[in-house]
Amino acid sequence: GEIDWAKMKQQGMDFAYIKATEGSAHEDKRFDKNWKEAKAAGMLCGAYHFFSFESEGAKQAEHFIKKVGDLKGSLIPVVDVEYYGKYAEIPPDVEKVRKELREMVGALEKKYGRNGFSDWAHSSAQ
């Protein structure tokens, strides 16, 4: 739905993470609008990616980077990893997920720098 970013800022919200991408092909159709409006309202913004168990980590990183581009002056990128669909009942292989997540984090780190992102992600993936 629509978000009134100015109202969110008035209510004391100082930052927002906005969904940009999912998997290796999906883009959130509201990302550009939400990003622009949240920044115009004076909020510090960060972009996040919804991790897919069906796509290679490197391809997901490439997709995210292509969509969001330069993130200077923004919050560090976030990768949202959670069980969805059939994986809620039958979780994916942990080692495969770790491998793909490490590849994604490595590519994001190469593009955006460490800034604590890698330390958190690597410890969480172990």
Positions of PLM-derived features:
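Substrate-binding cleft of extracellular glycoside hydrolase catalytic domains
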Residues: 1-112
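Aromatic-lined carbohydrate-recognition surfaces of secreted/lumenal glycan-active proteins
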Residues: 109-126
